[in-house]
Design a protein with these regions (language model features):
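N-terminal regions that are enriched for targeting/export leaders
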Residues: 1-11, 24-27
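Catalytic domains of carbohydrate-active enzymes, especially glycoside hydrolases
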Residues: 24-49, 286-287
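Alpha-amylase-like alpha-glycosidases and glucanotransferases acting on alpha-linked glucans and related
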Residues: 9, 15, 53-193, 218-445, ...
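Outer-envelope exported proteins of Gram-negative bacteria
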Residues: 44, 209-211, 215, 289, ...
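Domain-scale activation on soluble regions of proteins
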Residues: 35, 163, 472, 485, ...
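A short, glycine/small-residue-rich beta-strand->loop->alpha-helix junction that serves as a flexible
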Residues: 18-22
Length: 500
């Protein structure tokens, strides 16, 4: 079945409170998707973020970002006043997220809401309610964040030895000492899940499904690595011997040093990949389809000695291969899992075979199609139908920004290949959209910025850089009636029209 969707991070939605949330604007965007003939909304990971603001470095694989809690709904519940929300300074740039102001302004409001919410409830009742509504791993995240705050937001490797190594007497003492702070984080997760479930339910009522995103690796500064050190390649002091990344290539002479702890795949095998089954249960409950980041890491992963300043001296190690996906099929009771494999970059024959064996759709990105001239596997005439095509992803420049960066030879090849000229001058983004929608790929997903024709300033992320990543926001006026009608018309022309 041919379908289409739009890619837009929740954080990039318009909002009067500085960052997108599960607010009226999210519901309006779902209405827009329906009007535009779309079937999917693809988002980025929803986990809580820290330094760097990357959704791919989260404090937990089983928790939600409190930035996305809708403050308006908390006012409707009597937990905040409108004046309290409007008095907070979240920044005044409708195009840019100021994460420092979000952090400084949002948590005091959430704490006020928590104080009112827990009024009349004993700490025991708060934790009992959390026990009914939240999973064990989510509650472990709440404990982790309470302890982390106790140690001035430091990562767990800098905590006192007893709690760092999770000695039973220390765990008991900190749970007792921080019971109210734990309750504060449990409150956040309860509200996050309530609001997300309501938004997802509304999306389904409108015929829109959600494509989520799951990073392959857990962050070092996370509840996952602290609470379950046996899952990772840690020594007797719970420190990594090697960390994750990518080797040097044409884009980076020293490679990419991500710094995430690597999995102890032998332990995962012995336990039937139980932690991964729990993780996928959480994701399948949250989303309708799940994009699995860095799929090739399940075949082979790049291990960089811990402490190295660059990724130059890593080595390739074998991953779990098809075994983990066979276990998922058995666990979830079906051959066809709702997974999209992020299979971008250099692919070895064994990675290609793994993708074929799983049957998962891979990804095709048009911005990569013209790097190797006529030999590129990303050119639409080389696709099979079992794939998802994008003009670009969150890691790419916008279509307009990308095209402007090409030399004249490559621009001419792009124009010649996609038949540029059907649309008015200066609308190369629409030509690329048409090429994606017209391909044989079962699903086409277009970043909102590429429907809007925005330049590099609307880019979401530039890998291996720090600074203004993850900050772009859409305005309320962007997806106007004319653009929505054009999206719907193209979806119809190419046989991808969603439910009316």
């Amino acid at each position: 079945m041919r379908e289409c969707g739009m890619l837009l991070p929740v954080a990039s939605l318009p909002s009067r409170y500085g960052i997108g949330a599960f607010s009226k604007e999210a519901y309006d965007f779902i209405d827009t998707l329906k009007a535009a003939g779309q079937s999917f909304w693809q988002i980025l990971p929803l986990g809580p973020t820290g330094f760097g603001d990357s959704p791919y470095q989260s404090f937990s694989a089983f928790a939600g970002n409190p930035y996305f809690i809708d403050l308006e709904k908390l006012t409707e519940e009597g937990l905040l006043t409108r004046e309290e929300c409007l008095d907070a300074d979240f920044g005044n740039d409708e195009r840019d997220i100021d994460y420092k102001k979000i952090y400084d302004g949002r948590f005091p409001l959430l704490r006020k809401a928590y104080e009112r919410w827990k009024a009349g409830r004993s700490p025991e009742l708060v934790h009992e309610l959390a026990g009914r509504k939240l999973g064990d791993e989510t509650r472990e995240y709440c404990f982790y964040m309470a302890v982390k705050n106790h140690f001035d937001s430091c990562s767990w490797n800098l905590w006192d030895e007893g709690i760092r190594l999770r000695k039973p007497e220390a765990l008991e003492a900190y749970r007792a000492m921080l019971t109210d702070e734990i309750g504060f984080y449990e409150f956040q997760q309860i509200k996050f899940e309530e609001q997300w479930d309501a938004l997802k339910r509304y999306a389904h009522e409108q015929g829109i499904r959600i494509i989520g995103d799951i990073p392959i690796y857990a962050a070092f500064d996370s509840a996952d690595s602290w609470s379950r050190p046996e899952l990772f390649q840690f020594d007797e002091n719970n420190m990594p011997g090697a960390v994750a990344g990518c080797p040097p290539d044409g884009f980076s002479a020293t490679g990419q040093l991500w710094g995430n702890p690597l999995y102890n795949w032998e332990y995962h095998r012995k336990t039937g990949f139980a932690w991964w089954m729990r993780r996928m249960e959480y994701c399948f409950r949250m989303y309708d389809l799940v994009r699995v980041d860095h799929f090739r890491g399940f075949d082979e992963y790049y291990a960089i000695p811990y402490g190295d300043a660059t990724a130059e001296y890593g080595r390739w190690e074998k991953g779990p291969g098809i075994e983990i996906f066979r276990q998922m099929q058995e666990h979830f009771g079906g051959d066809k899992l709702p997974i999209i494999a992020e299979d971008l970059g250099f692919l070895t024959p064994t990675v290609r075979q793994l993708l074929k064996d799983t049957g998962f759709p891979g990804m095709k990105v048009l911005e990569f199609a013209f790097d190797a001239g006529e030999n590129s596997d990303y050119l639409p005439h080389k696709y099979g139908s079992n794939c998802v095509v994008y003009t670009g992803t969150h890691d790419n420049d916008t279509a307009e920004g990308w095209f402007a960066s090409l030399d004249e030879h490559d621009r001419n090849f792009v124009r010649e290949y996609i038949g540029a000229g059907y649309t008015p001058e200066g609308e190369i983004h629409w030509d690329l959209v048409r090429a994606a929608l017209g391909s044989v790929a079962d699903l086409a997903v277009i970043p909102v910025q590429d429907y809007l024709g925005y330049d590099t300033s609307a880019r979401i992320n530039e890998p291996s850089t720090l600074g203004k990543n993850w900050r772009w926001r859409m305005s309320r006026e962007d997806l106007n009636e004319d653009t929505v009608k054009r999206c719907r018309r193209l979806a119809g022309i190419y046989g991808r029209l969603g439910e009316a």
